[in-house]
Amino acid sequence: MPMKPIGKLIAVILITTFAFSACKKPLEYPLIPSIDFKNIVGVKDANGKDQYLQVTIGFTDGDGDIGYFSPESGLNDPMFDYPADATNPYYTNFKVKTYHLINNVWTVDTVDLSARIPYLTPLGSNKALKGEIQRELPIDVGLVNDTFYYEIFIYDRSLHQSNTVKTSNIVINS
């Protein structure tokens, strides 16, 4: 029995789809992570006061060695876990520097908002990663119409430092 025209069309679409997906090249990115600023928004409570900021960055990494396991797991290189304080530059791998506008002068804030990115390496032979990271940045209670911006970079497990991105300015009302 001959195939109907619609059946032929579906067969051609399926064969073409499988042929192109089989030929798809794996993602390739440089081994040094690269980031780009996506956005920063204030998350408000029911009274319209900022509770925290949510910043989003995009990233790529060619070998996918982004993020750490929890320190309690014992699966990280010890250099990423100990000491778990400011003397260890690699304890956190999502680095944030805060700038506060005070009397029309941008001043570096001493509060460290850096954090740990969780382990993100994919399974399989192609480890290249592309994605977004969202991070909540706490804000001080009582700030009214204060202006900030942030500089952010990340480290991968090979200690490659990404480029640094600057967020847009944001006015906080907490």
Spans of features found by a protein language model:
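C-terminal motif of bacterial Sec signal peptides marking the signal peptidase cleavage site
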Residues: 19-22
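Polar low-complexity intrinsically disordered regions
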Residues: 1-2, 147
